[in-house]
UniProtKB/Swiss-Prot annotation:
Family statement: Belongs to the GatB/GatE family. GatB subfamily.
Reactions accelerated catalytically: L-glutamyl-tRNA(Gln) + L-glutamine + ATP + H2O = L-glutaminyl-tRNA(Gln) + L-glutamate + ADP + phosphate + H(+); L-aspartyl-tRNA(Asn) + L-glutamine + ATP + H2O = L-asparaginyl-tRNA(Asn) + L-glutamate + ADP + phosphate + 2 H(+)
GO BP, sorted A to Z: glutaminyl-tRNAGln biosynthesis via transamidation; translation
PANTHER family attached to this UniProt entry: GLUTAMYL-TRNA GLN AMIDOTRANSFERASE SUBUNIT B MITOCHONDRIAL AND PROKARYOTIC PET112-RELATED, GLUTAMYL-TRNA(GLN) AMIDOTRANSFERASE SUBUNIT B, MITOCHONDRIAL
Stated name of the protein: Aspartyl/glutamyl-tRNA(Asn/Gln) amidotransferase subunit B
Record keywords: ATP-binding, Ligase, Nucleotide-binding, Protein biosynthesis
Assembly and binders: Heterotrimer of A, B and C subunits.
Length: 476
């Protein structure tokens, strides 16, 4: 029997506000444990939460970017559960009236585009963090407690781990462009839980789902879902039943392990939060937030294709992250050709970032310097081969491209008066290659060009070398 995979994702995104959602404590990553807290975060008796308007508007902004409808009337609820990192024994969240609902985003997998529906976007506060020490004690850090979150809940529209990965890529890109979050999974500002079930092809009713946690990267999401897909199929084919449960992804083995039997919403005993008033959102407020939205990735992609003439693949890669897209735009603003800038960013720049595991902002490369280097290639000052040496210097140490070329003596040799003596010396030492050329063996020219480039340490202009070489060969 063949099964259809059904996947839905719940993505938590930390909002990049200066303070927390219900307290005035800072909401910054990386501080000393329990240094970004106050009495609200510690849940002292008698203290009351105060809604952060900026967090609310960030939530609206994200929901609008995800094509959601904004709820005109909304409120917060208490989600009751006990855990050491949750001093109130409840979380302030939204249950039946989320800030946004009925949205969608478009993904593309293997050339096929598909809309993934978004059920809801709701606001909530984050919990603290438990730290289990090697001394046998567990510690609680409440810096994260009260950090504003949005939870983005998709419909179960994805049918493969690859579609789930594409959805996360598209979602991360959209949220990055809104600038409400930096969506860094490695820092915990974007976290994903996945729900997966199988059903026989043709069956409308969903199968019993498992929820996957500890998915700390997009690759782990894909690996966890791929394993769970196989595990559930094996259980069903052997006549067993899938249990509704929560499972943890094990990074070492790329498998999923049972954590607990899955709770339902009734286990959390939701009820309206009495300490945070209900609030209304009118059309004027919605349109004000909508007007603050920047150009979204899909719009930029379309512009790159229609106005700049870039291939669809280039446009897609350049808009995967706001950082790369903004860098590309700034490089063009400094006079670079669009296709050349795209090639460098997708090629040498991306390769360097991947190998060094850094982001563009961590390097010394600037749009001005990249554009300057491209100009030097186009005016013949340096060759593409020399440009790679210049690029390495620019991205590691910075500086002006022209100054780097001059300081390191990398200017391309194009003067016939300089090149002809070297060309003739190579010809004098390679009579066999001359004979091969005269006998119609074209590869002899390639060999001779290689020898000339070697003699000039790669600094000769290949076009000029070819022209002069052909002229000299005709004389012999």
């Amino acid at each position: 029997m063949n099964f259809e995979t059904v996947i839905g994702l719940e993505v938590h995104v930390e909002l990049k506000t200066n303070s927390k959602i219900f307290s005035s404590a800072p909401a910054h990553f990386g501080a000393e444990p329990n240094s970004n807290t106050n009495v609200v975060d510690w849940s002292y008796p008698g203290v009351l939460p105060v809604m952060n308007k900026g967090a609310l508007e960030f939530g609206m902004k994200a929901a609008l970017a995800l094509n959601c409808e904004i709820s005109k009337e909304t409120h917060f609820d208490r989600k009751n559960y006990f855990y050491p990192d949750n001093p109130k024994a409840y979380q302030i969240s939204q249950f039946d009236q989320p800030i946004g609902h009925d949205g969608w985003i478009e993904i593309e997998v293997e050339g096929k585009k598909k809309k993934i529906r978004i059920e809801r976007v709701h606001l909530e506060e984050d919990a603290g963090k438990n730290i289990h020490g090697t001394d046998g004690y567990s510690y609680v850090d409440l810096n994260r407690q009260g950090t504003p979150l949005i939870e983005i809940v998709s419909e179960a529209d994805m049918r493969s781990p690859e579609e789930a990965y594409a959805y996360l890529e598209a979602l991360r890109s959209i949220i990055q462009f809104t600038e409400v979050s930096d969506v860094k999974m490695e820092e915990g500002s974007m976290r994903c839980d996945a729900n997966i079930s199988l059903r026989p092809y043709g069956q409308e009713e969903f199968g019993t789902k498992a929820e996957l946690k500890n998915l700390n990267s997009m690759n782990f999401v894909k690996k966890g879902l791929a394993y769970e897909e196989k595990r559930q199929a094996k259980v069903l084919l052997s006549g067993g039943e899938i249990q509704q449960e929560t499972r943890r992804f094990d990074e070492a083995t790329s498998t999923t392990l049972l954590m607990r039997v899955k709770e339902g919403s009734s286990d959390y005993r939701y009820f309206p939060e009495p300490d945070v008033p209900r609030f209304s959102i009118d059309d004027e407020w919605i349109e004000k937030v909508r007007a603050s939205l920047p150009e979204m990735p899909a719009s930029r992609r379309a512009r790159y294709i229609s106005e700049l003439g870039l291939p669809e693949y280039d446009a897609m890669v350049l808009t995967l992250t706001k950082e790369m897209s903004d860098f590309f735009e700034a490089t063009l603003a400094n006079g670079a050709d669009a296709k050349q800038a795209s090639n460098w960013l997708m090629g040498e720049v991306s390769a360097y970032l991947n190998s060094e595991k850094v982001e563009l902002a961590d390097t010394k490369l600037t749009p001005e310097n990249l554009a300057g280097m491209i100009t030097l290639i186009n005016d013949g000052t340096i060759s593409s081969k020399i440009a790679k040496k210049v690029f390495k210097e620019l991205i590691e140490n910075g500086g002006d491209a022209k100054e780097v070329v001059e300081a390191k003596g990398l200017v391309q040799l194009s003067d016939p008066a300089q090149l002809l003596p070297m060309i003739n010396e190579v010809l004098d030492n390679n009579q066999q290659s001359i004979d091969d050329f005269k006998n119609g063996k074209d590869r002899a020219v390639g060999f001779l060009v290689g020898q000339i480039m070697k003699a000039t340490r790669g600094q000769a202009n290949p076009g000029v070398v070819n022209k002069l070489l052909q002229e000299e060969l005709s004389k012999r």
